[in-house]
């Protein structure tokens, strides 16, 4: 009986300490997309006399985030954001001496959930690493017409999953919230899009080339978390219990 009591207390003590430490904070974020050669960001397509290349050359993401601190070193984070990938593409026909360059945007929405681990660097400075998954949503296809051609990006799925990893540092002020700087890697499990680039000859006969885009990207993350006073929340809970 005594052994069972000790085991029960050992299980309840960590749970109670977790419950006391839970703090939820809300934040906003802006994430410029960084072109990176090693992320399969460029695709080359070709057929007889027609060549094309599509390359991720930037973009940005923005949205809101919610962080739930379970302990002083562990937290969960989720949110909702929009991502605009900007691609540049070229279309060439060597027999017609034709060359064209243009840009096209591909818009998506993301619902991530990650687990974070914090390492204290100073009195108010922390480093964190995060790993998790994201549900990615694509509302429509994208296209861009040029003088003698067209690029059309077909969404392969309206929703799919991806893996995300994050590394950053943050500074927690006394009453002015938390300022965060970091980087995020996002890679869908499946190809983002099937892309058709078409050259139209003098008789408007189409000469298409086709490929797929991985959709992987890297961002520089700028975030701000609004101030949340844990002591104030505890006082509110205590007051409710008394009432």
Positions of PLM-derived features:
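Positively charged n-region of N-terminal signal peptides that target proteins for export
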Residues: 1-4, 20
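Gram-negative (and chloroplast) outer-membrane scaffold detector with strong preference
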Residues: 30, 34-36, 67-144, 173-175, ...
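Predominantly the C-terminal beta-signal and adjacent terminal strand-loop region
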Residues: 158-160, 165-243
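Sec-dependent N-terminal signal peptides
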Residues: 4-14
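Extracellular/periplasm-exposed beta-strand and loop segments of Gram-negative cell-envelope proteins
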Residues: 36-57, 84-108, 136-160, 191-200, ...
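Short glycine/proline- and aromatic-enriched beta-strand/turn motifs that initiate or cap beta-hairpins
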Residues: 19-65, 223-233, 243
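Hydrophobic, lipid-facing positions within transmembrane beta-strands of outer-membrane proteins
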Residues: 26, 58-64, 109-113, 127, ...
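Residue-level detector of alpha-helical transmembrane segments in integral membrane proteins
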Residues: 7-9, 28, 105
């Amino acid at each position: 009986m005594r052994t069972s009591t000790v085991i029960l207390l050992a299980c309840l003590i960590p749970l109670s300490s977790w419950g006391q430490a839970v703090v939820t904070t809300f934040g906003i974020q802006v994430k410029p997309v960084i072109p990176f050669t090693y992320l399969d960001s460029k695709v080359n397509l070709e057929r007889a006399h027609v060549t094309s290349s599509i390359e991720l050359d930037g973009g940005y993401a923005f949205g809101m985030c919610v962080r739930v601190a379970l302990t002083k070193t562990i937290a969960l984070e989720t949110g909702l954001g929009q991502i605009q990938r900007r691609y540049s593409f070229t279309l060439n026909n060597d027999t017609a001496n034709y060359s064209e360059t243009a840009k096209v945007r591909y818009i998506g929405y993301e619902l991530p959930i990650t687990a974070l681990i914090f390492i204290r660097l100073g009195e108010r400075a922390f480093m964190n690493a995060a790993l998790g998954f994201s549900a990615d949503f694509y509302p429509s296809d994208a296209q861009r017409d040029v003088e003698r051609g067209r690029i059309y990006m077909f969404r392969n799925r309206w929703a799919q999953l991806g893996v995300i990893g994050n590394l950053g540092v943050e500074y927690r002020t006394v009453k002015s919230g938390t300022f965060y700087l970091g980087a995020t890697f996002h890679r869908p499990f499946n190809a983002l899009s099937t892309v058709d680039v078409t050259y139209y000859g003098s008789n408007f006969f189409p000469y298409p080339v086709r490929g797929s885009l991985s959709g992987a990207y890297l961002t520089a993350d700028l975030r701000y978390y609004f101030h949340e006073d844990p002591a104030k929340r505890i006082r509110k809970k205590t007051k409710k219990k008394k009432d």
